[in-house]
């Protein structure tokens, strides 16, 4: 699917599209351009209200201009529209704001159902609200106090066992520079002061939820030289981008409960949960981006808050190119760099089962995650099960 067709499809799923269907329009018809631009401005105002941080006027003006130009091309040329990075950045902001693929603040372990960008996801999240709260409580930020960590953290982690969290190996590399892995074992030294912080939500302080990282328990095996992705040399789908970390207990501070992980040997689901089109959500700490992202630059100081972002699986494990192990799936959730290590969670089902470990994304096009049901044996081995 081309970029233009993909965004037309997403816009046809948003909140405005639902209103048009009720009025007799064809199913999946995107709403008018003025309505989408109004929704984008409403989302910017909502972020200002929630954070108390005023939007940067120049970045806001540029973003609205990019969105206007992108929508003009998209609606004028349809699925054959030519879209550059500037237009794609504008469209990504639109789908975050119109209910297609929102990025929502987590407050008190849930989202505000009044958020203007929530759209049709409000009903889905309400249905599994207790499960979502449990997941949000068990997702933390991998904090790095060193001067080279410009955002103050390196990624996201989530509780996978008693005192244990899962994240990406490349997140571990950022907090243990020079560390290497061999046969599932890590050799290296953690930076001083690194920790996992299960709070940092918008809307005020919560009880302290920070736990120092004690040690590295296990890491996923490295991929061979022959399995590097031909278009993205830093990616190697033959390797497992996983690290299990043990956290220090803190007196008087309860440790979050482990998140349920879907298993490939489950006798009921039989490894078939993470299918194409299934609704999922991701909880993490979106931070920097390797590509221009004006929506993020509008609010320079608020990128490190805990967020929840819903979406869908684009391709299930076994359908992704250059994946020799058949353990990678793709999804269309809006993500940025700090989301590395996030859990991809079932939204259509129980609202709490981890279906994937997010590890990378091709900005504005697709994101990659290890399918939980395809790494059951590896995860069991890492946890000593």
Predicted regions and their residues:
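Serine endopeptidase catalytic core focused on the charge-relay Asp
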Residues: 130-147, 151-154, 158-162, 166-337, ...
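Protease-domain processing segments flanking chymotrypsin-fold serine proteases, especially trypsin-like
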Residues: 1-155, 308, 312-316
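Polar/charged alpha-helical tracts
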Residues: 42-45, 73, 130, 296-303, ...
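C-terminal subregion of chymotrypsin/trypsin-like serine protease catalytic domains
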Residues: 2-42, 46, 315-329, 336, ...
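Short, solvent-exposed coil/turn linker segments
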Residues: 106, 112, 119-125, 212, ...
